[in-house]
C-alpha cells in the first residue's frame, strides 16, 4: 500500500489533458471485443491468514463482429468471472478490455509489480556490480597473490554447505523408507545405521569447514595488511579505470530503473483515467444474461419494472416509449405483452429466462454475454432458448459470448470455442477444428464426458480423466498459449508442441 501511495502524486500530475484509449486497428479488423492479459484476483483474510485466489490468470482472446464465441470449462474454472469482468461487474486486477476499439476496463496491478520488481532486480544488479568492482580493485592492490586462493576457498565452502544440506535430505528420505519395515527391531537397527552414517559424513565435512575458515581468516588478514601499502601510479591508474567502468554501468542501471518507473506511472495514470471516463452509452451496448433466472430477477418488481430498469439508468423516463419498447421486446422473446404487469414467481423457469433475455435486449445491445443461460432449465426448454438466441443473433446482428460447461451445447451454436481450466485458456479453435482435432488433455476429458445416444457405443465408451501431474511435465519449461496451426491455439511447452504436431500429421 505504501508503495502505491509513494507515486500517487506523480500519477495525479499526469492525469490532466488526456483522452480515452482508442485502438482504431481493432475496428478495422472487425473485432468487437478484445481481451488482453486479463487477470482477476480475489483477496481474503487479513494479516498472516490473508491469501489470494487467482480466479482468472492471463487470459487473452478476440471476438469478431457477428461471431458467437464459446467459453467452456468445468465449474470453478473462471468462466463466469471472465464474463463479469468484461462487463465491469468486477474491477479487474490487471489487463485491458477493448469494446469496439475503446478501452472499457483495465487494471494496473501488473504495472505496479513491474515498477517494484524492476527496482528489486536493479538494486540487486547494482550490488553485484559494486561487489565485482571491489573484487577487481582487491586483485589490483593485492601484493600477496592470495585473492585467487580466497575465491577458491569461498567456492569450496559453498559446495560443502550444499553437501551438508543434501546429506540431511537423503537421511530423511532413507529414514522414511526404513519406517516401512515391519520388524520393529530391524527397523530400529536400520534407522540407527542411517543416523550413524550421516553423522560421520557431517562430521568429516565440519572438520574441513573449520580448516578452510581458519585458512580464510589468515589469508584475509595478510591481504588487509598488504592494502595498507600505497599503490604505484600504474596500479592507481588501473584502479581508476575500473571505477569509471563500473560507475558507468551502475548509472545505466539507475537510468533504466527511472525510465521503467516513468513509463509505468504514465500507463497507470492512463488506466485510472480510462476507468473513470468510461462511455456509459457504449457500455449499455454490452449486456449480460445470467445463469439463474430465479436469483437474477427481483421478486418484488413487476416484469415491466425489471425490463425498464436499464432504460431508467440511461435516463430514459418516457413512460409511453418505454412501454412500447417493453411490449416489442417481450414479443421478440416469445412472451405476451400482457405479462408485463406480472411478477417473476408467476412464470416457469424457461419464461423467467426469456424475461432475463428481454431485459438485456431492451437496451438494443451489440454484444451479449450469455452466462450459462440454459444450465438451470429442462432439456426441452434448453433447445427453445438456444434457438431463440440464434434467431435474435441473426435478426439483430448480435455478437455473443456463450459461457457453458458442456461442449455438446456449444458445438453447433458457436463459431469458435475457448476451453478454460483453472483460470487459463488451454485451447482455442473453431468449433469444427476443436471437435475434429482436440489436442490438450483437458479438452479430451471434456469430450469424453459427452454421452452418446447409442447404447452400444455408450457401453464401450471410456472416460478420460485429466490429471495435470500425470499429463504434463513443466519442471523444466513453462507452457505458453501457442498457435499450432492457423486459428488453433493450445497451451503447451516445446516438448508438448512437438507431440501435438505429430498428432496433427496423422
Question: Could you tell me what each predicted segment is?
Answer:
Residues 1-33, 43-47, 52, 109, ...:
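Short catalytic/signature loops enriched in Gly
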Residues 321-338, 447:
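Conserved ABC ATPase "signature" region
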Residues 343-347, 351:
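Conserved ABC ATPase signature
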Residues 357, 385:
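Hydrophobic anchor residue at the start of the ABC signature
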Residues 364:
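Conserved catalytic motifs of ABC-family nucleotide-binding domains
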Residues 410-412:
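A short, surface-exposed alpha-helical micro-motif characterized by mixed small hydrophobic
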Amino acid at each position: 500500500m505504501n508503495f502505491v501511495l509513494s507515486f500517487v502524486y506523480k500519477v495525479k500530475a499526469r492525469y490532466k489533458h488526456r483522452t480515452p484509449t482508442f485502438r482504431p486497428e481493432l475496428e478495422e479488423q472487425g473485432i468487437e471485443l478484445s481481451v488482453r492479459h486479463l487477470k482477476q484476483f480475489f483477496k481474503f483474510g487479513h494479516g498472516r491468514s490473508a491469501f489470494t485466489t487467482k480466479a482468472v490468470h492471463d487470459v487473452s482472446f478476440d471476438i469478431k463482429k457477428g461471431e458467437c464465441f464459446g467459453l467452456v470449462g468445468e465449474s470453478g474454472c473462471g468462466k463466469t468471472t471472465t464474463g463479469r469482468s468484461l462487463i465491469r461487474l468486477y474491477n479487474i486486477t490487471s489487463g485491458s478490455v477493448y469494446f469496439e476499439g475503446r478501452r472499457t476496463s483495465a487494471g494496473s496491478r501488473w504495472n505496479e509489480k513491474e515498477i517494484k520488481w524492476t527496482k528489486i532486480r536493479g538494486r540487486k544488479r547494482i550490488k553485484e556490480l559494486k561487489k565485482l568492482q571491489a573484487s577487481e580493485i582487491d586483485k589490483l592492490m593485492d601484493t600477496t597473490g592470495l585473492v585467487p586462493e580466497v575465491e577458491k576457498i569461498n567456492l569450496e565452502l559453498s559446495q560443502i554447505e550444499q553437501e551438508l544440506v543434501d546429506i540431511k535430505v537423503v537421511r530423511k528420505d532413507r529414514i522414511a523408507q526404513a519406517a516401512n519395515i515391519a520388524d520393529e527391531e530391524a527397523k530400529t537397527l536400520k534407522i540407527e545405521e542411517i543416523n550413524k552414517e550421516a553423522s560421520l559424513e557431517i562430521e568429516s565435512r565440519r572438520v574441513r569447514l573449520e580448516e578452510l575458515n581458519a585458512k580464510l581468516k589468515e589469508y584475509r588478514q595478510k591481504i588487509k595488511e598488504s592494502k595498507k601499502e600505497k599503490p604505484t601510479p600504474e596500479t592507481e591508474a588501473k584502479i581508476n579505470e575500473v571505477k569509471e567502468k563500473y560507475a558507468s554501468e551502475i548509472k545505466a542501471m539507475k537510468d533504466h530503473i527511472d525510465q521503467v518507473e516513468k513509463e509505468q506511472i504514465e500507463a497507470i495514470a492512463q488506466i485510472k483515467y480510462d476507468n473513470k471516463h468510461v462511455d456509459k452509452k457504449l457500455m449499455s451496448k454490452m449486456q449480460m444474461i445470467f445463469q439463474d433466472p430465479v436469483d437474477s430477477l427481483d421478486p418484488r418488481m413487476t416484469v415491466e419494472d425489471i425490463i425498464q430498469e436499464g432504460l431508467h439508468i440511461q435516463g430514459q423516463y418516457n413512460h409511453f416509449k418505454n412501454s412500447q419498447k417493453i411490449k416489442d421486446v417481450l414479443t421478440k422473446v416469445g412472451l405476451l405483452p400482457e405479462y408485463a404487469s406480472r411478477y417473476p414467481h408467476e412464470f416457469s423457469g424457461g419464461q423467467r429466462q426469456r424475461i432475463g433475455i428481454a431485459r438485456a435486449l431492451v437496451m438494443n445491445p451489440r454484444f451479449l454475454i450469455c452466462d450459462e443461460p440454459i444450465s438451470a432449465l429442462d432439456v426441452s426448454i434448453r433447445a427453445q432458448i438456444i434457438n431463440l438466441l440464434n434467431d435474435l443473433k441473426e435478426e439483430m446482428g448480435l455478437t455473443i459470448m456463450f459461457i457453458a460447461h458442456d461442449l455438446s451445447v456449444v458445438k453447433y451454436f458457436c463459431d469458435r470455442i475457448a476451453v478454460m481450466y483453472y483460470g487459463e485458456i488451454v485451447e482455442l479453435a473453431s468449433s469444427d477444428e476443436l471437435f475434429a482435432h482436440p489436442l490438450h488433455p483437458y479438452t479430451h476429458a471434456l469430450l469424453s464426458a459427452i454421452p452418446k445416444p447409442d447404447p452400444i457405443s455408450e457401453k464401450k465408451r471410456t472416460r478420460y480423466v485429466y490429471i495435470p501431474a500425470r499429463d504434463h511435465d513443466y519442471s523444466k519449461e513453462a507452457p505458453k498459449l501457442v498457435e499450432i496451426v492457423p486459428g488453433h491455439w493450445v497451451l503447451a511447452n516445446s516438448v508438448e508442441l512437438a507431440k501435438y504436431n505429430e498428432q496433427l500429421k496423422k
